[in-house]
Amino acid sequence: MNRQQRATYVAAALVIAVWGASTLGMAQDCPELVGRWPYGPAYGVRASGSFAYFGSGAVLIIADVSEPAAPHVVGKVDLPGVVWGLAVSGDRAYVASGEGGLAVVDVSTPASATVVGGLDTAELALGVAVSSGYAYLVDRDAGLRIIDVSDPASPFEVSFVDTPGVAWGVAVAGSYAYVAAGFDGLRVIDISNPAMPSEVGAVDTPGEAIRVAVSGSHAYVADGLDGLQVIDVSTPGSPVRVGSLNLVGYAQAIDVSGAFAFVGLLEFGLRVIDISTPANPIQVGSMDTPGWACGVAVNGGSAFVADYFGGLRVIDVTDPGSPFEVGHIDTPGEAMDVVAAGSHAYVADRSSGLRVIDTSDPTSPVEVGHVATPGQPMGQPMGVAIAGSHAFVAAFHYGLRIIDVSSPASPFEVGSVDTPGEAYGVAVSGSYAYVADGNGGLRVIDVSSPGSPAEVGFIDPPGGAFDVAVAGGHAYTAAGDAGLLVIDVSSPSNPVLVGSLSTPGYAQGIDVSGAIAWVADDSGGLRVIDVSTPANPVEVSFFDEGYGRAYDVAVAGRFAYVANFSRLMVIDVSDVTEPVEAGSFDTPGLAWGVAASGEFIFVADYDAGVEIFQVCPEWPFADGFESGDTSAWSATVP
């Protein structure tokens, strides 16, 4: 080997080394989060003074409720996770933010509320109580975490108690913390020395202890299907169940004020219970809410209900026997699917219709339009596609809805077609919309006149249809436990099943690129299927590393982006026979849908809105070289 050959070899090795290093960097930097629209349903609420504090997805919202009939938002702050529970003490809000752990928010000036500190936790932060400089946080399977918040900017854990079951809720009274531990009932923790807590008592409850409130010598437990349970804790080491009240629905939330307990019953709204005789609680009032009552807080003569997709409901309870709503603030529901076109993203909000998000500045997306679909909350938009100036919404029990989005700020429905099944997904090709209609199979809709759509064909193969992609005269459907189905739609009025392939999981998302179909197969991960011969699809590889459940997939360039329950997975599929993980991002909600558009990836994150990511680079450098000048890689040695 002469000197020049040796130099060429060394230069080539350097390129390989740089590529390897860049690949590692990409695994860390890809996907790169660019922006968030983090709004979603309301789970938790607290009230203090003239303000109500509640969650909308991963946003803490502060509302002025000094006039209960006219509540209005005065501040908001984005958080690292979904707002499951919160406590307010002085000018700080302490938020149990799900995957984001504990967030400490300065609310002294509501209009400029700011996160001043936080602490990641091992599990899912579901509830929090604050007392004497400590936050007591329930962290799902990780029990009770005791966190020193004397310096709000630098909270740190001082101890924990690994309670049995699922730690859902917590209340603190005196020297004791009371933990609602799911099917393991109520646990009583001595916190007289926060650094050395210990469980001193427990009582089983007949249902699932979700939330707890303490007043005087009694703890009041929202016990799931078993309603309200009243526990005498006058002797904390020997708690005793002394009363109960069966309620219609699922007791999810509770607060106590005076002689009354206020219980949130999910879809059955608010119940007011007289607890003046703890051994004999009596329902005295009720009020159904439009959503699901997930959280409740009482302040003065008002009850504030975190009503899931119903937002914040303000209820006058000055007469506990006759509660009535006086005001509300709406929130979005669950982001099930997303598609992007131009400078807008379109979100299928299962609980409240189609939302239009301006993404012209992807670092700061803003909602600009919304249209409700019929039958809310049962309309349940599950999928969305865009063609021209129309959005096509798969609306579950309400079939296909066609929305004019020519003016994004004022979308309106122009046409619809009821379908016999449950419309989960939709794809548009030419003059036809193809609806994955669950048990109703694949429906083919002529949308050449969007105001007068008409079904022209259908096929009801085994397994149903839960998502669909159309390419080259074929519709490819994710068919649940039937796997992948290939349907010839060259004659839209006469679709014909021409090929199929069973998958090990439950096929519910699909994308097609070239001769490859990419199937999000739930527990089966990502399946890579050669469909170059549509009648004979063949799996060439798969990626299933136990990272959760693959719900949806979008392919852009050399990468497959998989909505994988709690994260976005990025899979390098440049060699389709050997997919390799290139990166991942833990999303604050449940990554349910994913779409690629231009240089961005959009994730529908269920109860945390939408995240926008930069498309991962095809190569470590845009042109394959570190600089734009290839001579920088010259191997010539004088």
Locate the predicted segments by residue.
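Short regulatory "switch" loops immediately downstream of catalytic or recognition motifs
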Residues: M1, I16, T373-P374
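Bacterial N-terminal signal peptides that target proteins for export
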Residues: M1-A13
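Bacterial N-terminal signal peptides
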Residues: A11-S22
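Extracellular glycan-recognition surfaces and repeat-rich motifs
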Residues: T630-P638
